[in-house]
Amino acid sequence: MTVRIAINGFGRIGRNVVRALYESGRRAEITVVAINELADAAGMAHLLKYDTSHGRFAWEVRHEREQLFVGDDVIRILHERTLADLPWRELGVDVVLDCTGVYGNREHGEAHIAAGAKKVLFSHPGSNDLDATVVFGVNQNELRAEHRIVSNASCTTNCIIPVIKLLDDAYGIESGTVTTIHSAMNDQQVIDAYHSDLRRTRAASQSIIPVDTKLAAGITRIFPQFNDRFEAIAVRVPTINVTAIDLSVTVKKPVKASEVNQLLQKAAQGAFHGIVDYTESPLVSIDFNHDPHSAIVDGTQTRVSGAHLIKTLVWCDNEWGFANRMLDTTLAMAAVGFRLDASASTKL
């Protein structure tokens, strides 16, 4: 079965989803039938072909009127502002990947379904009333056919949750703090300009900028047992891609740094292969650009204090890794089938 998807929003994540689909060789499993984006077709084609972070796309890209051609594939281009007007039923869409960053609650998901989509996957955490929030590699096996409106969480949640699970299963986490060192994003300014967040009025290329984060809430959404036991802060730094996360946890069992690294390296080679990677090479952020893993543990930075306080540094390509997980979750949603009875929905 080939899953027919539509993409709503062709920004950083939407474009990387298309690139990842073609580069990963999954076109026999997933077909993009339509992209809804308010920008014009010429701009869409150009930014798909040329990307400052990820380089030139290897596939031929062109557009004619309201059609985007990727190799021999034809993708319909839409410019609808209203979700109810999207022709998902006409196009036979199985799953909508909503990558706008604007929509993310149950009402928005139901609008896609009313327009004819069978399921919806949001590219950000979304509201608490969705059917499921999935961190692929950790809880995708809990998906059911009735889970129609799903969130793929965030790039940072996908990065840190597998590591938290591994440490908790092995040593028992008491509490933790997280600092996200995140590349600049397009909600920041090129030069000083107005923004509702006064820190984000400042030029992104000239400062390390503290911003709000809901990562702690994202952790407890996946692991409710950690409610009020994790806190998170975030800063944006003057790079355009790749993120590092500084994770500190207190654990019940005494442990050594070498044992932590052995645990994480074994997981990267085994149960979490393809999701978690492990390195002890002397690398910097640019070296993780275009890395498809959700998390890359930097074993050179693991520390243990007093046998119970663990500090780790985890890298991720916040665009490419997350785009690959969007594809993984899409296939997982399709694999459990499509149940169209809305009353049967049960929350994960």
Swiss-Prot record:
Location, primary (coarse class): cytoplasm
- Positions binding substrate in this chain are S154, C155, T156, R200, T213, K214, R236
Report a single Gene Ontology molecular function: erythrose-4-phosphate dehydrogenase activity
Please give the catalytic activity noted in the UniProt record.
Answer: D-erythrose 4-phosphate + NAD(+) + H2O = 4-phospho-D-erythronate + NADH + 2 H(+)
Amino-acid positions noted as binding NAD(+) in the UniProt annotation, renumbered to this chain: R12, I13, R81, N318
Q: Where is this site: Activates thiol group during catalysis?
A: H182
Residues of the active site are: C155
NCBIfam families, alphabetized: E4PD_g-proteo, GAPDH-I, PRK13535.1
Task: Outline the subunit composition.
Answer: Homotetramer.
Tell me the protein family, please.
Belongs to the glyceraldehyde-3-phosphate dehydrogenase family. Epd subfamily.
Q: Know the name of this protein?
A: D-erythrose-4-phosphate dehydrogenase
Q: What is the lineage of its organism?
A: Bacteria, Pseudomonadati, Pseudomonadota, Gammaproteobacteria, Enterobacterales
Which gene is this protein's source? epd
